């Protein structure tokens, strides 16, 4: 179109060879005019083209951004499709099974137990065959080959170990229905010591036991560590302690002398007497003293002995045969410890609660089987070497006579209520010169703490043991009609003495907080003694006076009536029948 305009504007060019100069000049002038016009229009066209280029570049940038967004969307869609495909493929896969590893074979395969079958399968290269342990759970693919190692089973049935078989890899266990079964020991159990009576975790499907389960069935009844109590902390029982040392320590420390004299060591000791007089304390001190003696004999820095503290009432079980089984487990454990040459003390506290006279039961006859079980353990076919049975009771008359005969509980030691001299010894254990003593009391003894403490003890013991009107406690009537007045000293005990000292210490603390005067005074002890008596004025709290008297340590003629003679805050009490007493005392 532009070329056509140019041809019009230019006109017709003269023919070649034309001799008309005017025509040529006119043509050239037109050509020059056209060129001048084009030259004038050139910047405008250039500007238009530049604007067009900018517009195109802008459009190109927008299209590129849109293209990038589309590409990102496509990539995300592709990733989602791939993930969905993997999810579909995963959900479409057959379920993976589990099995229990039994053993590895030389050809690179292994034996497993799964689905009630024992199989020999291949192992994935990603699993180290040497790292698999007996009893370990493994994951299987659809071909039942091992593809991953798992943990050991953590759930199952509880069984009781009876014994380890000779190969050391199997065990005889007893289930909850007393059914015996031979099981395999998983590898974790091969590295530890397990003993008869331990509760084990059993996978009944594979027949493996995996771990020892802490079970309070026997553990809560047995305290194996030796108590940190020695004879020096026991006051007023020197003669009884000497008897126990002769019965317990001599046979173990000098077995050659006993053998030379053909003397059999005692199998058991019975500590009997009223409550709160130190029976349990002595039994604890026996184990500690024996451990120290063993250290002296063997030359070891720390001697070793075991103290099995059997809590009688907790040993009882409502199921038939369970109590007897617990007793067997206790003595089985004692034999295991004693087989190492270590002395073992089996202590039955409140012995009458377990081993009552056979036939004395009212609602049951459980003692008819419990007592023979203990007798069989003490002197049955299996002897007790290095095992000493100690029983404590405040109703020894209720214990079956077969247990108390010689050859079983040979040594019988009565723990009496403390007299005045024994009470001084007991007070000296709790009222020591190292306590904060009041300056006034110290000044009376020229500042000597030992003399002041001794004088305090002397004063409070005289207050407790004086047969005065204020110390009268009970009037008892015997079956023959005789009457007797009993004083508080007749019911004194080491536990009561400790309580009196503790009361006095609390009074001293309160006096310091209220008055600013620090130190224990003899007045605190005397007041504590009075408060202790007042608190226990309702101590006889049973409707059977004779039973109460037997528990309290009063033996002899049967008591048919008890009348209290305590001087109360309102003056002298005329006495009252025991049937009307409602409060509960501490020491029964």
Swiss-Prot record:
Pfam families: AAA, Prot_ATP_ID_OB_C, Prot_ATP_ID_OB_N
InterPro entries named among the record's database cross-references: AAA+_ATPase, AAA_ATPase_domain, ATPase_AAA_core, ATPase_AAA_CS, NA-bd_OB-fold, P-loop_NTPase, Prot_ATP_ID_OB_2nd, Prot_ATP_ID_OB_N
Database matches in Gene3D superfamilies: 1.10.8.60, 1.20.5.170, Nucleic acid-binding proteins, P-loop containing nucleotide triphosphate hydrolases
Coiled coil: 47-94
PROSITE patterns, sorted: AAA
Annotated GO MF terms: ATP binding; ATP hydrolysis activity
Residues covered by region (Docks into pockets in the proteasome alpha-ring): 587-588
Disordered: region residues: 1-22
Keywords noted in UniProt: ATP-binding, Chaperone, Coiled coil, Nucleotide-binding, Proteasome
Binding site for ATP: 276-281
Reported function: ATPase which is responsible for recognizing, binding, unfolding and translocation of pupylated proteins into the bacterial 20S proteasome core particle. May be essential for opening the gate of the 20S proteasome via an interaction with its C-terminus, thereby allowing substrate entry and access to the site of proteolysis. Thus, the C-termini of the proteasomal ATPase may function like a 'key in a lock' to induce gate opening and therefore regulate proteolysis.
Similarity remark: Belongs to the AAA ATPase family.
Subunit organization: Homohexamer. Assembles into a hexameric ring structure that caps the 20S proteasome core. Strongly interacts with the prokaryotic ubiquitin-like protein Pup through a hydrophobic interface; the interacting region of ARC lies in its N-terminal coiled-coil domain. There is one Pup binding site per ARC hexamer ring. Upon ATP-binding, the C-terminus of ARC interacts with the alpha-rings of the proteasome core, possibly by binding to the intersubunit pockets.
Name of the featured protein: Proteasome-associated ATPase
Origin species: Streptomyces griseus subsp. griseus (strain JCM 4626 / CBS 651.72 / NBRC 13350 / KCC S-0626 / ISP 5235)
Designated gene of the protein: arc
